C-alpha cells in the first residue's frame, strides 16, 4: 500500500475500534472517539 517502509509502518501500525471503526494509536486502551475498550490491530494484509 505505501510506497516505502516508513509509510507502510505509519499507515498500518494502528488500532481500529470495533464499534465506530476509528483509527487509534497503537498504545491506546480506549477509543478516542467513542470510549469503547474493544480495539483490534489493523490488518496488515488485504483480504482477497
Swiss-Prot record:
Pfam families: Ribosomal_L40e. One of its GO terms (biological process) is translation. GO terms for molecular function: structural constituent of ribosome. Keywords: Ribonucleoprotein, Ribosomal protein. Gene3D superfamilies: 4.10.1060.50. One of its GO terms (cellular component) is ribonucleoprotein complex. The keyword Ribosomal protein applies. Belongs to the eukaryotic ribosomal protein eL40 family. NCBIfam families: PRK04136.1. This is Large ribosomal subunit protein eL40. It comes from Methanosphaerula palustris (strain ATCC BAA-1556 / DSM 19958 / E1-9c).
